[in-house]
């Protein structure tokens, strides 16, 4: 996962870097901290296998901003695109590269829109001059049906 930047604050304006440091100082680690998802590719594959999903599963290791630069890593089209990387730069890159691959009437789910200001800023900037309707899922999640 990418490191947060200054723009990446909570909805209350708290610095993400300070918040994560507080959690680490309290002994919260990567295994039980829901704010930081850290697991091996093997764990990811095991989780997909629980749901009998084995086909068309390609796991790509590395920072999203780098892995999305490699054309071979990209699918031809996307039906459901779920973004959950928290920060401005990663969300911005995901939208720039992946949203154009989202099929018409495909679904975009943004996990962190309501919580992290950086993710919200990236989404708002990307869709500034595009006519889309955003639906509120819950406090933090948002959904857009691709009509473009």
Region locations from a protein language model:
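S-adenosylmethionine/decaboxylated-SAM
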Residues: 1-148
